[in-house]
Each structure stands twice: as structure tokens, then as C-alpha cells.
């Protein structure tokens, strides 16, 4: 049996990832870009929605998880959809409201995502394409169904692994990775439903449905993807003519771990300037702020204050999002 003094940081990280199941990136600002957790949310807005973002989790912790991504989504044949939204190139000196959500008509949407997720010596790159169909249930409510297909590359970076203390004890998992046998490509399928109107939403999505059934590459190390479920919901409520509040939730589940529950409250001023707070059960308290910089650009920042056992080692987490709205 290995003693703590013989275990390297990378083995600790591997064990931690297996236990905590952080196989999928975590997004504090999920409420502002639900497309990243549900392909059914592709094309909700009638313009080309481009997002680039970066996230540093557990700042101050050596080899902490880092995530960066870019996404783009758009309805097909957008020119046939009439919208009051008409973004310009200039920066705005006044209030720029959120674009409207149009319901009551059939539409199709496509999108793509590129995600780079790294934690310690482990790196995951994934390129994904999505398609969604939006069905009008009534004039005010739509139900969309989205699918995704992606290719993920899971790599063990041998040069980033450092052994804390030498040991003669044989550990097959550790030996397999440090022999540079960790480069596997895995096909990923996902799907999701998204019910929405101008003021409310409810979604359910599943990711990594194929697990590791379809894989290829030069490695023999065992990357073991698990099916992930995401359930989201929220409703926008007016407080007065200038303020709205949106209570929302995100539930994440991966067998056999316990569900992760996140509750969020977003306060928005004239659909232009917003702030939000989230509580991630036994993990973090999150503060967020953002605004529409102009008719074309939007910005969001969040800070995670850890309340887990890692709070004494980490100064928190940071996430920055820049959105570009193209008409």
C-alpha cells in the first residue's frame, strides 16, 4: 500500500479527478451561455452568437484546472426572422438592452465549440458540432431538441508530472501514465431538450453518451468518460420598470457520485447591466458582474470563493467571458 509520502502530485490529482468526477469543465456563468451545457440552447437568439472565455479554478493552487473555450451558434436562414435587434459596429455611450428571444415559429440552428481543459499533467481538447430544431408549442413557448457530436483528445503530459519521492512500490495506473501511454481520442455524443419563452427556461442535457466505446489513438492508459447529466431552469421576474431578478438552478449528475446543485440569483438593470450570485453546494460561493458594452459586444466576469476543503490552499477562481453578437 502506498503511503502519502510516496505519492506524487500527479497521482493525487488523478485520484481526485476520479473521485470528484471533474471530467467536464465547470462554468460559473452558465446562465449567460447555456449553449455550453445544453446543445438544445443553440440558436435561441436570431443572430450569430460568438463567445470566447477563460477560466482559472483554484487560483494559487499548483497545477490548478484551467479551461478556455470558444463557441459560435446561429439559426439557419436567419434573414427570414424579423427582429428588433440590429447591432452596429460602434461603441455605445448609452444603455444597450439584451436582444429579444423570438418564439412561435419553427427554426433550425447549428453551432460549434472548441474547449481546452487542463488540470495538472492532464489535458483534454474537444471540438464539437451541434444541431438544434426549435418547435413552436404556442405563440409564446418553444421546445428545442439539440444534438452534438465531437472528438476529444485526452493526453497525459509526461513532462509536467513530478514525482515527489522515489518509491519501489509498483502502481500500474501510475506506471502506465508516466510511460507516456496516455494519448487517446474519444468520440463524444450528446443531446438535450430546451423549453423556453421570453421569460423562462427549463433544460435537460446528457453528455459523453458513448463513454469510451469509440476510441482510437496511440495510448493504452484508461481514460474512462462517464455520462454527465445537466438540468437547468429559471424564470425572469420584474421588480419594477428598471429591475428584473432571475432565480435559476443547475443540477449536474454523474453516476455514481452525488448530484452537484447550484442555485443562482441574477439582478439585471434595464436588461443592460447585471450582477449575480451563486451557491454551489459545499464547493463555492460565486459573485458575477457583466454588461452589454455595445450593440455588438458583451462582457462578464465571475469570482469563485471556495468553501471546500481546498479553501486554505486556493485564493478562489476567476472566469472571464467576452461575447460578440453578429447580425
Range-by-range predicted roles:
Residues 1-3:
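N-terminal hydrophobic targeting signals that begin at the initiator methionine
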Residues 17-21:
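Sec/Tat signal peptide C-region and signal peptidase I cleavage site
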Residues 22-327:
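Subset of outer-membrane beta-barrel
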